[in-house]
UniProtKB/Swiss-Prot annotation:
Region of interest (Disordered), residue spans: 1-63, 78-134, 152-181, 1445-1661, 1696-1715, 1735-1758
Gene name as annotated: cdc12
Residue runs in coiled coils: 674-715, 1260-1290
Domain FH1: 740-972
Protein name as it appears in the record: Cell division control protein 12
UniProt modified residues of type Phosphoserine: 1541
């Protein structure tokens, strides 16, 4: 057998071929029998013989001994088949060997005429479609086709016996076959109908016992084949035989005749077993599964679909893809199964069908793919091209286009057979025309009809939609079809020319006759670059072929003979033709322009003459017609400006599109590189954003729906209300009382006015809630006008009256006219005059005074008329100068001309001002009128002569053109040789020779032409080397190199801008400027920080800098040419070079470029934050609106406020801003606010409102945001992204041709732009949702959402309320806790109250009491020696080191009176050092304590200097004792000290003597200081006693005896002072040591704010009185025990106090006895005065030790100590309390006398306790002594020593 497509030998054996593992090959039953006979079980039916489809000279070569010719008819075959079915034992019918049946020839192959599946004959293939292999020899015949079957020889080893028929009960097993016997699969061509084969059905159950193929669905659907096999054996033998015959003909089997004959001889049982055992072979998934994709189908499936014509368009596309991608084996199998013939059959069916099928375009595409894979099929299967040619007139454009492309490719192979088949195809197309037409007439006519339809469907040329429609898909498909068709025509012409055979007549003439020129003319109307190219190719080819084929004998002979040309020219020279020809040549040569332009001009004339000559020779037209046609053809070829412009636009658009495609490709590649996880994460994020947007939209929709429902209800209510009003009004009018009344009209008006007022209120409320701005501005103005009219009497005269005003109209250059008018003029005349004046003024105001160097082209018309109109406005004054005023104005330096009446632009600079009278002023307008009148007569005023022009440039020798110096040396050598004869130029510039050139008028001079001698001289110069010597001798020095070496770089940029560049690019200081430019152009990530700077106005708004750097610019829009080639940018400095290469060079799109980068960076940086903030604000608004607790709290506040307010201030609601006023409403004592009361109320009575702060946690976060700033930022980003999209689509960024070649802005922006736009859409939706939610929430709470301030403060007010409420709650809780703690402390103190006096009167203290009585008697009996002496106020000299600043003292206060200052006993230093209190910063921690306790910190083994010296006072010259004590603390700085003046106290009395010697004290300062304190003390005394101190010489620390108060006055003062609290003003000179009281009642805030060392006299630690009595030595141990007990009690009472361990005082310390002994009588008297009772009590609270000495009848105030104790017991006002044997005082009372109960208490703790109390006066000295005695803490006797 021979396969024609593969070129195999006819005797080729299939033993060596391995079949593909397809189901059909795998399921072939049994081995093949030896082929000894050539019998056939199914002869093929005949097919139409087409002469053009048969390959010439190939059928005779196929000869073989096995060739036999048979021809069968369908009728004969059917009769044989039917006869065989009736006889089961007979084999299949055999065809006689030499019988032939002739069938009439048909025009077309009709598939429906084929009777059965075997009706299609397959040619040129080695395999048949059904039954045995087909014969290969094809004999050409005009009427029939003789088929000679060829049977290949069978190998001797290939015979195997058939399997025995199996037993029905035993399953039949397949016999193993050798692989070499496997054959290639054979596919069946199923029947289209089942009408031919008879159906044998059972009469009983009517069951089908036939194998048949069922086609289901439409032709386009995927069909499945179902093979019906009966489950039981057919009852009839005929049915079984028929089923068996069909079974054998199935394509899965490939039996030869011997095998079929042996199978036919089997018994019916064996046949049925054979059928049942092999039925499993039909169960092929690739055939049976309908849902299986076509790409997974086998080759045979596609072939079956093609033959059945049931293949869909998608399956054809899949087949085309498989044909281009599968292996050669797959394609070979497709060809072996007659796939190409099936495609041809299907295409023929589509061409003949009246119904347009979408698969028609895919069939040629499959053919093209197959032919490209196997180019040999073009010659072996050339019959397919006839059907493809017919496809050129398909109703659809796409099949035409694909067919044209296929034929173009085939013609490129230059196969002659193809051209002849194409001719047959075109003839078939023309078969429908009765008369004879050109070959291509039918095809070209169809082509032309399509173009005309498209032309009619186009919009008019003037329509703006025409350009937009050109890019529609239909237009693109049409243009592609036209381009493919023209390409096919051009290829057809070229192929016919190269093959030199083909069509009988000339192809170009046939195309012309078919109307190709009309088609080309129509196609010219469609602007397409590719189509234009093909049209030009055709026209050029036609022109070339026409010229080459036309014989021009006369012309050729004429042009070839030069002598004839010259003779003809000589003949014409004398007549008119010669003159015109000479004139034409002269005009061409004299034409202006360069040589290239002259060449173009000559080409135009030459082409025109050639065209005219050619047309006159070729056509028989007249000369005029030929000339007109030539001109038309020539002008059509010229490109117009519009065409060129459109071409440029298209080129730019194409380039932009290409770059966008590249960018999209890169973006897709980047997405692919992301990987699955990143891509999924990105998509999930987008889905989440979309979900958020959808949820927000749902919320918004629900809100809008609610609002719409409310509006609908309101509308219905309003309609009902209106109806009610109308009915009421109707009833009112028709009522009897109304008709009888006289004031009925007034009643109606009153009723309507009431309703109107009510409606106004309702509308106002609704507008507040819903409208944007409340009342419209226009409506508000109208209301104001009506109110004014209603308030004033409105008359016509008042309405028409126009107030006096001055008409202010600015003139050019600050030239003002003030036009006034009176109110007495009528309205009409005033209107006319104002119109005239306005017109004139506007005309004059439109003038422009040009600046320096600007041409003036403004025309002023009728200035006099304008002046007249202005004058008429000015009440028609007699003269212009009386009323018109023109202000003088300054003329800038660059303004040098006033506009004048001119008809042509004046040359720059303009002439000076014609009417200028002085330096900076203009003349009166009258003079302007004079000038205008003169110019009206003269017509044109002569202009002033222009300034002299700049010096002209160099004039070149050739043509007298001006040549710049830089170009003067660049003249071509030819021009130079013509002028000077020199052909050589110097290598470098030489010194110039200055002479007077003679370049003209040399005709009759010596210089007319060079003589022979001159030529010799010139040759000598060239050869002798003189010119070389000139080069060396007269060479000029290169100034450029010297400038480079000596001069620095040119610097145009300002220093400030250079600093900015240096700051922003400091990280890149090590890089080259070109590298920085490259990084910026490549949009490097490291340059994002500089984007803001490079796009700022400081950088861009530099006009002077740009102008200076303009010569260095590179014009990238014109191909990157330098603007000025002489300028070298390398001369510039670093930042100037950077500026010119970026901002100046790319100035056309730099702003948009940087803006794009800025928008991108901002969106990438702030998008997430903005979305989060918008969501937060929306969520906060929803939480606030939905919070029931907060709304209940607001109602509670409303009810409380309405309860507090009067009736006028009652409210139904309040704004959120009112919450901020709650902390400002205080109670009567100003201690608590309404917010404190609200907290208490909520905690006691409304606990459900207590926990509203956590519900509003989001509101607290939203309060930190600025809503207005967020809205503005979001709007700017959205607007910026939209502008960026516009710039990339049609703006500055849409044309990449003007970009820098290295600029990658589009590659960065475009991939991101889609994502950025999507983000901005999301952000826009979030912003809209936020605004909607917030506005609804604000309206819900009664706020104004249109007020930006209210919107910004909405959440902040709520947050402020939450913070204030939390503070109030904390204050309440703290106050309650302190009250509870104080109550507990009071109970503890009250428990020990009764034990105080008992301990004082106990026997243990008897000796102490007696000693005290003796001590008091001694004091009273002291003789006052020097009281009569005048008090000397000499200065006290003290050292600065003894002055320390007392904290918290006032400058106006004086030391407390009635104080006895006692020096302290010394303590043990070691115990004190262990527990030292903390002191404020800036003061030494131990100074005050050491001084107070007489402790000096010393190093180990040293003795204190104070202990060595002893604390002894020395009597001063003045006789005054200044101080008896020293102060505890030095200067302590605290917050409470701010603003208070420091008071100075004496630090250590014992060191006064040494300090006086070292550094004298400023006595004058001290006197002023003491006098101020004293005056302050006197003022306080005078307020209480009504008496002023008379003795001003007494020290502030003592009290005069005259001022001692009585017992009753003290009692009344004490009671009255309990109601008032006055702050104490401490003295400047605090000479007391601090005292401590346990009964301090402190305010809670004072404890936190007061200093560690509180101000006041109570800070002084007062030591107990230690009398110098020797009897007390015995009781030292008892005193120590009492001291320890008191210390322990204090520890229990004040557990936080720091205890200082006590010890015996060292001998030598001074006590009160020593001081009294050493002092004079004056000091003793002062002691006695201080022991007097307390004079007055200024402060509230009960005196803790209010000792008041009883006055005896004799006037003396002496009493025993026991008497005073008895009175102390009886006094009810003395609330002495006993705490463990010591005296303490009630915390509810404010003590006047702070008494140190235990010296072991820490000084710091004393101050802490005292800081909680109200400052009061210090106690008396005697009271302090008594308190010390009562507490049992008497000093031991060692103090005296």
């Amino acid at each position: 057998m021979r396969n024609s497509s593969k070129g195999q030998d006819p005797n080729f054996s299939y033993d060596s071929i391995l079949s593909t593992p397809t189901p059909s090959a795998r399921r072939t039953i049994g081995p093949r029998a030896p082929k000894s006979k050539t019998t056939y079980h199914k002869p093929p039916s005949s097919i139409e013989s087409v002469s053009t489809l048969i390959q010439p000279n190939k059928s005779q070569s196929v000869t073989s001994p096995y060739v036999k010719q048979f021809t069968f008819s369908s009728k004969e075959y059917n009769s044989h088949n039917k006869h065989a079915l009736q006889n089961s034992q007979l084999p299949l019918p055999k065809t006689p060997e030499k019988s032939t049946v002739h069938r009439p020839k048909a025009n077309k192959v009709e598939v429906t005429d084929l009777p059965s599946s075997s009706s299609v004959e397959h040619l040129h293939t080695s395999k048949h479609l059904k039954g045995p292999r087909l014969p290969k020899n094809i004999i050409k015949s005009s009427e029939d086709v003789q088929i000679a079957p060829v049977t290949p020889p069978v190998h001797s080893r290939s015979f195997d016996p058939l399997p025995k028929p199996p037993v029905p009960s035993v399953p039949v097993s397949k016999t193993k076959r050798r692989t070499k016997h496997k054959l290639a699969p054979v596919v069946e061509v199923p029947e289209i109908t089942n009408e031919v084969s008879p159906k044998f059905t059972s009469t009983n159950d009517e069951q089908v016992y036939r194998l048949r193929s069922i086609r289901a669905g439409s032709p386009n659907s995927v069909c499945s084949f179902q093979f019906e096999i009966p489950s039981t054996r057919p009852p009839s033998l005929d049915q079984l035989i028929h089923l068996f015959n069909d079974f054998l003909r199935h394509p899965v089997f490939d039996f030869d005749e011997n095998a079929i004959e042996m199978l036919q001889s089997c018994t019916p049982d064996e046949k049925w077993c054979f059928i049942r055992s092999n039925f499993a072979g039909f169960d092929d998934p690739s055939f049976q599964i309908p849902e299986l994709a076509a790409v997974h189908r086998p080759v045979s499936w596609f072939v079956i679909q093609l033959w059945n014509k049931t293949i869909s368009n998608l399956q054809l596309i899949t087949l085309s893809s498989l044909l281009s991608t599968q292996s050669d084996r797959w394609i070979s199998l497709f060809l072996e199964l007659q796939g190409l013939r099936a495609l041809h059959n299907l295409l023929t069916y589509f061409n003949s069908s009246a119904v347009v099928q979408p698969q028609q375009a895919e069939v040629p595409r499959c053919m093209l793919t197959l032919l490209k894979k196997k180019p040999t099929l073009v010659t072996s299967n050339s019959y397919i091209f006839q059907a493809i040619t017919v496809t050129l007139i398909s109703p659809n454009l796409l099949p035409r286009k694909v067919a044209a492309d296929l034929l173009t490719w085939v013609l490129s192979l230059k196969e002659p057979l193809v051209v002849s088949i194409l001719e047959t195809g075109f003839k078939e197309i023309n078969a429908e025309y009765e008369k004879e037409v050109p070959l291509f007439f039918g095809w070209i006519k169809s082509f032309k009809d399509i173009i005309l339809e498209k032309e009619l469907a186009r919009t008019p040329p003037s329509s703006p939609a025409r350009n937009s429609a050109s890019s529609s898909p239909s237009n693109i498909a049409f243009l592609e079809y036209c381009t493919s068709t023209m390409e096919f025509i051009n290829q057809l012409i070229v192929a016919c020319e190269e093959l030199e055979q083909g069509f009988d007549l000339d192809i170009l003439d046939s195309l012309r006759e078919s109307g190709i020129h009309e088609v080309i003319q129509l196609l010219r109307n469609f602007p397409d670059q590719q189509l234009e190219k093909q049209l030009n190719i055709y026209e050029s080819e036609e022109e070339r072929r026409t010229i080459s084929q036309t014989t021009h004998e006369d012309v050729d002979s004429f042009m070839s003979n030069e002598s004839s040309i010259l003779s003809s020219f000589n003949e014409f020279a004398s007549n008119e033709v010669g003159r015109l020809l000479e004139s034409t040549i002269q005009n061409i040569l004299l034409a202006k322009g360069t040589e290239k332009q002259k060449v173009k001009l000559i080409k135009v004339f030459n082409s025109l003459l050639q065209r005219i000559l050619l047309n006159s020779k070729v056509s028989n037209e007249s000369f005029e017609d030929s000339l007109q046609a030539s001109l038309n053809m020539l002008t059509e070829r010229f490109y117009s400006d519009d065409t060129a412009r459109n071409a440029l636009k298209e080129a730019k658009a194409s380039r932009a599109m290409a770059e966008k495609m590249v960018i999209e490709r890169d973006a897709m590649a980047a997405q692919v590189n992301l990987g699955a996880e990143d891509l999924i994460a990105k998509l999930n994020k987008e889905v989440e954003d979309q979900k958020d947007v959808i949820l927000s939209q749902k919320r918004t929709n629900e809100t809008l729906k609610t609002e719409i429902d409310a509006l609908q209800k309101s509308h219905v209510t309003q309609i009902q209300r209106s109806e009610v009003e109308l009915r009421e009004l109707y009833l009112l009018i028709n009522s009897d009382s109304f008709q009888g009344s006289t004031n009925s009209k007034e009643r109606i008006i009153e009723y309507l006015l009431d309703k109107l007022d009510l409606r106004k209120k309702e509308i106002a409320a609704e507008s507040t809630l819903w409208s944007n701005d409340g009342i419209d501005d226009k409506l508000r103005d109208l209301r104001e006008q009506m109110s004014r009219q209603s308030s004033q009497p409105s008359t016509v005269s008042t309405i028409l009256q126009i107030p006096d005003k001055k008409f202010h109209r600015p003139f050019p250059r600050h030239l003002h006219r003030y036009v006034g008018r009176s109110a007495s003029e009528s309205l009409t005349s005033e209107k006319d005059e104002s119109i005239k004046s306005m017109k004139g003024i506007d005309d004059f105001a439109n003038l422009e005074i040009p600046g320096k160097g600007i041409e003036s082209n403004v025309v002023i018309k009728d200035i006099s008329n304008q002046t007249h109109e202005i004058n008429s406005v000015e009440n028609k004054a007699e003269t212009v100068s009386n009323n018109s005023k023109i202000t003088n104005f300054d003329i800038p330096n660059d303004a040098t001309s006033l506009p004048t009446i001119i008809t042509h632009p004046t040359p720059p600079p303009p002439p000076p001002l014609p009417v200028k009278t002085s330096l900076n002023t203009f003349s009166h307008p009258d003079s302007v009128n004079i000038v205008a009148n003169d110019t009206s007569v003269a017509g044109v005023m002569p202009a002033f002569p222009p300034p002299p022009p700049p010096p002209p440039p160099l004039v070149s020798a050739a043509g007298g053109k001006f040549v710049s110096p830089a170009v003067s040396n660049n003249i071509s050598k030819d021009d130079l040789h013509k002028t000077t004869g020199l052909t050589r130029r110097p290598t470098r510039r030489l010194k110039q020779m200055h002479w007077e050139k003679l370049n003209s008028g040399l005709e009759f001079t010596f210089w007319t032409g060079p003589s022979d001698e001159a030529n010799k001289i010139l040759e000598t110069l060239h050869t002798s080397g003189v010119l070389d010597e000139l080069d060396e001798s007269f060479a000029m020095k290169e100034a450029k190199t010297l400038v480079k070496k000596t001069c620095a770089r040119t610097d145009y940029m300002s220093s400030e801008l250079q600093k900015l560049f240096g700051i922003h690019f400091h990280k890149l200081s090590h890089k080259n400027p070109n590298e920085i430019i490259r990084m910026i152009l490549h949009c490097d990530d490291s340059m994002n920080e500089c984007v803001e700077f490079l796009s700022s106005d400081k950088v861009l708004n530099q006009p002077k800098l740009k102008a200076d750097l303009e010569p260095y610019r590179i014009d990238w829009a014109n191909g990157g040419d330098l603007v000025n080639s002489e300028k070298d940018a390398s001369e510039l400095s670093r930042w100037d070079y950077l500026y010119v290469r970026l901002i100046v060079d790319l100035g056309g799109y730099w702003n948009q470029r940087m803006n794009a980068l800025k928008v991108k960076n901002i969106i990438e940086t702030n998008y997430e934050n903005l979305v989060r903030q918008t969501k937060l604000i929306g969520r906060a608004a929803l939480e606030l609106r939905d919070s029931k607790v907060f709304k209940g709290l607001l109602y509670l506040i409303l009810y409380l406020g309405n309860y507090m307010n009067d009736y006028v201030r009652q409210a139904k609601g309040f704004a959120i801003g009112s919450l901020q006023r709650l902390p400002l409403i205080k109670n009567a004592n100003n201690t608590k606010s309404l917010l404190h009361i609200l907290d208490i109320t909520i905690r006691k009575h409304f606990p459900q409102f207590d926990n509203f702060s956590p519900e509003l946690s989001t509101v607290t976060e939203a309060a930190k945001l600025n809503i207005e700033a967020i809205e503005q930022e979001c709007s700017e980003l959205i607007r910026g992204c939209q502008n960026l999209q516009i710039d990339c689509d049609s703006g500055a960024l849409s044309d990449p041709t003007v970009f820098h070649p290295d600029d990658k802005i589009l590659s960065v922006i475009l991939p991101w732009l889609m994502e950025g736009t999507k983000k901005m859409d999301f952000l826009k939706e979030h912003l809209r949702t936020m605004n909607t939610t917030l506005n609804n929430a604000m309206r819900y709470f009664g706020e104004q959402p249109n007020d930006p301030n209210s919107k910004n403060l909405f959440f902040k007010r709520v947050d402020s309320f939450i913070i204030d409420y939390s503070k109030a709650r904390s204050d309440n809780l703290k106050s309650e806790e302190e009250e509870a703690s104080q109550h507990r402390r009071l109970n503890l103190v009250n428990n020990h109250k009764e034990h105080v006096l008992e301990r004082a009167m106990s026997e243990n203290n008897k000796m102490d009491n007696e000693a005290m009585d003796g001590f008091l008697d001694k004091l009273r009996n002291v003789k006052l020696e020097s009281h009569h002496k005048p008090r000397n106020r000499s200065a006290i000299t003290m050292g600065k080191e003894h002055l320390i600043e007392a904290p918290n003292t006032s400058t106006k206060s004086s030391p407390a009176k009635n104080e006895l200052f006692v020096p302290k006993r010394s303590s043990v230093k070691s115990d004190l050092a262990k527990v030292r209190p903390r002191y404020p910063k800036g003061s030494e921690s131990t100074d005050g304590l050491s001084d107070a306790l007489n402790i000096t910190p010393t190093k180990k083994g040293e003795v204190s200097s104070k202990a060595k010296k002893g604390y002894n006072y020395e009597k001063r010259r003045s006789g005054r004792q200044v101080s008896d004590s020293y102060v505890l603390n030095k200067n302590s700085k605290n917050k409470s000290n701010k603003g208070r003046s420091a008071s100075y106290t004496f630090s250590d009395p014992s060191s006064l003597e040494d300090s006086n010697r070292q550094k004298p004290f400023n006595g004058e300062k001290f006197r002023r200081f003491s006098s101020k304190s004293r005056r302050g003390s006197q003022n306080r005394d005078s307020k209480k006693t009504g008496k002023a101190r008379k003795d001003k010489g007494i020290n502030n620390n003592q009290t005069s005896p005259q001022n001692k108060p009585s017992k009753e006055s003290l009692k009344s003062d004490t009671i009255s002072n309990e109601k008032k609290v006055f702050p104490q003003k401490a003295s400047k000179v605090n000479l007391l040591t601090p005292t401590i009281s346990n009964g301090t009642r402190a305010s809670k805030h004072a404890n936190e704010k007061e200093n560690t060392f509180p101000r006041g006299v109570e800070n002084n630690l007062v030591a107990p009185m230690i009398p110098n009595n020797t009897e007390l030595n015995e009781d030292t141990s008892a005193v120590s025990r009492n001291l320890e007990n008191a210390t322990n009690d204090l520890k229990e009472t004040f557990p936080t106090t720091t205890t200082i361990s006590t010890a015996r005082a060292k001998p030598g310390n001074n006590d009160i006895n020593t001081i009294l002994r050493r002092n004079n009588s004056r000091g003793r008297r002062r002691m006695l005065q201080q022991m007097s009772p307390l004079k007055s009590n200024k402060f509230s609270g009960t005196n803790d030790l209010n000792f008041q000495q009883a006055t005896k009848p004799d006037g003396s105030n002496k009493s025993s100590y026991m008497e005073r104790l008895e009175k102390l017991k009886q006094n009810s006002e003395r609330h002495l309390q006993s705490v463990g044997g010591k005296k303490v005082y009630s915390s509810e009372e404010t003590p006047v006398n702070k008494i140190l109960v235990s010296p072991s208490v820490s000084i710091l703790d004393h101050n802490r306790i005292l800081s909680q109390s109200t400052p009061i006066k210090s106690p008396q000295r005697a009271q302090e002594m008594l308190a010390g005695l009562l507490s049992g803490k008497l000093a031991p006797k060692e103090n005296e020593k």
